């Protein structure tokens, strides 16, 4: 299989078993002339560096924003930021990289996953995977600080109650965009320092 074939099969988000997906791929793309086991596929896929997927993702995002007619709300482009904890396979390598959560039941390898999503154009524009004890605010600050999309003007970053902090407001005002804003839901007792 070529690098392109591995990437194509991997991003298909197969609804069937891996072997059924591989068989369908080879039937459609290679006229069924090749048989490939899921073990051989997994071994080959493991040789692909995660950076390849990051670069592919960034290329898709950049291409979209170069060419798309972007929707806006009263001249503003809205980007939601949120995070969650994601359970990962329990391997030593992942445990060392992302940490183990032990607060509920058996220990579980988890990562903090944060995402910035274009609310009006339906596109994930940035993500972060971090240690399970990392802060959603730190991930949001990092995504806001590295925000660089072509043809985006007047971005507004929308976040829930867990995010309000002066450091996030500062991060959004440091961007090169002329008008940048952050909008956070806050508890009633929230106090601005």
Model-inferred region functions:
Residues 1-193:
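Conserved, well-structured functional cores that handle cations and Mg-NTP chemistry
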């Amino acid at each position: 299989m070529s690098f392109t074939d591995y990437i194509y099969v991997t991003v298909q988000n197969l609804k069937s078993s891996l072997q059924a997906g591989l068989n369908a791929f080879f039937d459609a793309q290679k006229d069924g002339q090749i048989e490939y086991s899921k073990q051989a596929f997994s071994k080959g896929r493991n040789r692909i560096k995660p950076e390849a997927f990051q670069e592919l993702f960034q290329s898709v995002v950049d291409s979209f924003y170069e060419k798309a007619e972007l929707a806006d709300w009263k001249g503003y482009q809205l980007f939601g930021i949120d995070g969650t904890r994601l359970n990962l396979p329990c391997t030593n390598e992942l445990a060392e990289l992302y940490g183990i959560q032990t607060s509920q039941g058996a220990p579980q390898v988890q990562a903090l996953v944060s995402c910035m999503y274009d609310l009006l154009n339906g596109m994930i524009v940035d993500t972060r995977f971090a240690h399970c004890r990392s802060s959603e605010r730190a991930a949001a600050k990092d995504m806001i600080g590295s925000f660089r999309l072509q043809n985006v003007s007047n971005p507004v970053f929308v976040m829930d109650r867990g995010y309000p902090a002066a450091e996030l407001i500062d991060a959004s005002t440091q961007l090169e965009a002329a008008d940048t804003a952050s909008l956070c839901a806050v508890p009633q007792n929230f106090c601005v320092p």
